[in-house]
Amino acid sequence: MDNRRCFLCGRNGAQDPLERHHIFGGAYRNKSEKYGLVVDLCGDRCHRNGSLSVHRNGNQMRMLRRHGQLKAMREQGWTEDDFRQEFGKSYL
């Protein structure tokens, strides 16, 4: 049984299949993978095309990056400066 849910809306992906989103993309995509900074999102609604999707809504993207930074700092025992060294800037 698959218990995955969209990080943003909580749906199970039955109507809109879930996609894996790397919180820090581009040059930091591999580091997102390495540190587990990925979330499942409804592919159309929450990931790519909805008005509140992370690729169309700056507030959603900022919220996810803040969440990702706090998760990384907590799990890795990092300071804000440590995070900055790994990911180039702080999102707090």
Predicted regions and their residues:
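Short cysteine-rich loop/turn motifs with clustered Cys
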Residues: M1-E19, D44
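Short, solvent-exposed coil/turn linker segments
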Residues: N12-A14, G25, T79
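Amphipathic alpha-helical interface surfaces
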Residues: D16-E19, L37-V38, G68
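Histidine-centered catalytic micro-motifs
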Residues: L18-G26, G43-N49
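A near-ubiquitous, low-amplitude feature marking generic local secondary-structure context
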Residues: H21-G25, H55, R66
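Short linker/helix segments within small regulatory modules
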Residues: F24-V39
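Short Cys/His-centered divalent metal-binding micro-motifs
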Residues: V38-L64
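Short flanking/linker segments adjacent to small metal-binding domains or redox-active Cys/His motifs
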Residues: M63-L92
